[in-house]
């Protein structure tokens, strides 16, 4: 089966690898986003899918745009793929592309559609504190994740899962379901989504990383594990941005009349902070302009003590 693969992040690269390992699939072209400046030094960096594809000597293209890109349309028509596989590519496909392959464009989406349609289903399901999610293999149409369902399977979200671990699990499941779908593509009966049950997973805004001590411990923890890759969670301390790199929920009693944000205790493993309904333990921190520190080094470096208020 001749395939064009469209994808960008590690999640997609893992699935591409599984496709390459299947001898009946011939990856004719890999389409990914353009290289982008990354980090403080703004170093031009290729997306993970490009790096992976080049290791296997696959043909790679990186169009700046899809809509109205006649040159790119002609490239696809010349290849004449039986299917275009789309995994976290990052752009909506125009009708001209959807109509090219014999079996259409097949998307691997990291949620149980119609729930969590959109760009950030893994982050949003973690932020919402859900304990179940999954993968949907969908035949794409012109809408945002509105196409017919070809295959679907759910998995449990563990309490200690974060965006990194859950992405890996879903990527593995996505590869398995995609391969199963492609092998049986001519026999699968598509199922329409129930639009009345649709929920949405819009892109993450950097501002969503800011937490407040007036939030509950679970809210803060869910945001921490959802936004661990980007933008991370942070608060403001003495007018500077304070990033929280590692944390956990803790327990202490007799917290009535204690102001949220108060440091309740300091030990070898972390700083205990009062929040809306309990306590969190800060284990690794970084103040704006400084380096990442263990809680112990942070306490020593900034002369923090029990009873101080982090604000």
From Swiss-Prot:
<feature type="binding site">
    <location>
        <begin position="111"/>
        <end position="114"/>
    </location>
    <ligand>
        <name>(6S)-5,6,7,8-tetrahydrofolate</name>
    </ligand>
</feature>
<dbReference type="InterPro" id="IPR041711">
    <property type="entry name" value="Met-tRNA-FMT_N"/>
</dbReference>
<dbReference type="Pfam" id="PF02911">
    <property type="entry name" value="Formyl_trans_C"/>
</dbReference>
<dbReference type="GO" id="GO:0005829">
    <property type="term" value="C:cytosol"/>
</dbReference>
<dbReference type="GO" id="GO:0004479">
    <property type="term" value="F:methionyl-tRNA formyltransferase activity"/>
</dbReference>
<comment type="function">
    <text>Attaches a formyl group to the free amino group of methionyl-tRNA(fMet). The formyl group appears to play a dual role in the initiator identity of N-formylmethionyl-tRNA by promoting its recognition by IF2 and preventing the misappropriation of this tRNA by the elongation apparatus.</text>
</comment>
<dbReference type="InterPro" id="IPR001555">
    <property type="entry name" value="GART_AS"/>
</dbReference>
<keyword id="KW-0808">Transferase</keyword>
<dbReference type="InterPro" id="IPR005794">
    <property type="entry name" value="Fmt"/>
</dbReference>
<dbReference type="InterPro" id="IPR002376">
    <property type="entry name" value="Formyl_transf_N"/>
</dbReference>
<dbReference type="InterPro" id="IPR011034">
    <property type="entry name" value="Formyl_transferase-like_C_sf"/>
</dbReference>
<dbReference type="InterPro" id="IPR044135">
    <property type="entry name" value="Met-tRNA-FMT_C"/>
</dbReference>
<dbReference type="InterPro" id="IPR036477">
    <property type="entry name" value="Formyl_transf_N_sf"/>
</dbReference>
<dbReference type="InterPro" id="IPR005793">
    <property type="entry name" value="Formyl_trans_C"/>
</dbReference>
<comment type="similarity">
    <text>Belongs to the Fmt family.</text>
</comment>
<keyword id="KW-0648">Protein biosynthesis</keyword>
<dbReference type="Pfam" id="PF00551">
    <property type="entry name" value="Formyl_trans_N"/>
</dbReference>
<protein>
    <recommendedName>
        <fullName>Methionyl-tRNA formyltransferase</fullName>
        <ecNumber>2.1.2.9</ecNumber>
    </recommendedName>
</protein>
